């Protein structure tokens, strides 16, 4: 399968076993749900009426005072009382098969290529870590919402993109299904695509 470099107009042969898969939408959805669920901290905790501090004694007698009846200082309707349905720490982790995860990544990458949202560059570098320089470079190739994938951590690109909410720079090892579908277009370097071919072969 052939893909053209955007900076040199040369042709590069990419692996069909990775970049020419049928788009499996139900699988991609399932993997994204699992991925987001695994990122949840699940540490929220509240105290119920049985856990908050306070006396168990009835504040006043049931009848004769003219006041509303009450049985406990720890009642949820009282100030400093417990929470009615107190949240407890919970594990949201869902099972995710490695084979399914890898296929979902391949499926997304293949669909990005089919939709002409995948741009290959021999190299994509900027001289100084300046947002202005990066913006100008992206404007020249008409890219606004873009995910830039490099083979290694690129400090200049990383610093230049930090203040741009529509631009994200990651290295190959940080690829995941959520980030791949979060941007309109994907820009990838030759060294990064070679690493992907090794990782997902």
UniProtKB/Swiss-Prot annotation:
A cellular component term, taken from the record's GO annotations: ribonucleoprotein complex
Keyword check for Ligase: no
Pfam family, one: Ribosomal_L4
Domain of life: Bacteria
Keywords of this entry: Ribonucleoprotein, Ribosomal protein, RNA-binding, rRNA-binding
InterPro entries xrefs: Ribosomal_uL4 (IPR002136), Ribosomal_uL4-like (IPR013005), Ribosomal_uL4_dom_sf (IPR023574)
Region (Disordered): 45-75
SUPFAM superfamilies assigned to the protein according to its UniProt record, in alphabetical order: Ribosomal protein L4
GO biological process annotation, one example: translation
UniProt GO MF annotations: rRNA binding; structural constituent of ribosome
Keyword rRNA-binding: yes
PANTHER family in alphabetical order: 50S RIBOSOMAL PROTEIN L4, LARGE RIBOSOMAL SUBUNIT PROTEIN UL4M
Role this protein plays: One of the primary rRNA binding proteins, this protein initially binds near the 5'-end of the 23S rRNA. It is important during the early stages of 50S assembly. It makes multiple contacts with different domains of the 23S rRNA in the assembled 50S subunit and ribosome. Forms part of the polypeptide exit tunnel.
Subunit relationships: Part of the 50S ribosomal subunit.
Family statement: Belongs to the universal ribosomal protein uL4 family.
Protein name, entry field: Large ribosomal subunit protein uL4
């Amino acid at each position: 399968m052939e893909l053209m470099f955007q900076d040199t107009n040369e042709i590069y042969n990419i692996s069909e076993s990775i970049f020419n898969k049928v788009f499996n939408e139900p699988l991609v959805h399932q993997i994204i749900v699992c991925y987001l669920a695994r990122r949840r901290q699940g540490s929220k905790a509240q105290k119920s009426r049985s856990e908050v501090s306070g006396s168990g004694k009835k504040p006043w007698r049931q009848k004769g005072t003219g006041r509303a009846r009450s049985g406990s200082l720890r009642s949820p309707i009282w100030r400093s009382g417990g929470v009615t349905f107190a949240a407890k720490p919970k594990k949201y982790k869902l099972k995710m098969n490695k084979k399914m995860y890898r296929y979902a990544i391949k499926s997304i990458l293949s669909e990005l290529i089919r939709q002409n949202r995948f741009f290959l560059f021999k190299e994509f570098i900027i001289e100084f870590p300046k947002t202005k320089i990066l913006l100008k470079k992206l404007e020249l190739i008409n890219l606004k919402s873009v995910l830039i994938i490099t083979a290694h951590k690129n400090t200049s690109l990383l610093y230049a993109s930090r203040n741009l909410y529509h631009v994200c720079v990651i290295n190959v090892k940080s690829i995941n299904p959520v980030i791949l579908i979060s941007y309109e277009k994907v820009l990838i370097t030759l060294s990064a695509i070679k690493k992907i071919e090794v990782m997902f072969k």
